[in-house]
Amino acid sequence: AFNRRSASAASAKVASWRRIGNNTIPATAKAGGQYLNSILAKVEAEKSGYQEAILLNEQGYVADGSGENIFVVKDGILTTPPVAASILEGITRNTIIALAMEEGIPVREHNIGRSEIYFADEVFVTGTAAEVCPINEIDDHLLGPPGPITRRLQGRFFAITAGKDARSADWLYYADGK
């Protein structure tokens, strides 16, 4: 996982390591041992000159990043793998789905084939540390700069987390009690 608020986009590599399946450890459990294959995938990606890894599940579908959920935009539709695809459920993922729906962006949870990420209009990952990070290259396939849907959702997310989005003020709780 990484924090990319200051970066324009990141490169990613589809890892040779697979996401741990639901029949091994419940994928919804945020268990420390479950992150081992994510660490291996991340190291593999970095050794190959990429900033992030994308893991496939046991069926060969896109699951998630090394510590992030993944979203793909094609023809204006935002797609993310379903929970049944052995993904790690994420609060940031749920937030982006809710924001997209508020913004009138069609959202679907659907299995994503490896080739779909190469030919997507936009790809981004989300997570507590990554927040909303555009992906501009996957396995030497250039996707280009962050697209309009990614920028729109990223901007809205950043405004919310900075306390500058009145529409979502009830989403925030200030630790100092104010």
What are these regions (language model features)?
Residues 1-178:
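Helix-start/capping segments and mature chain N-termini
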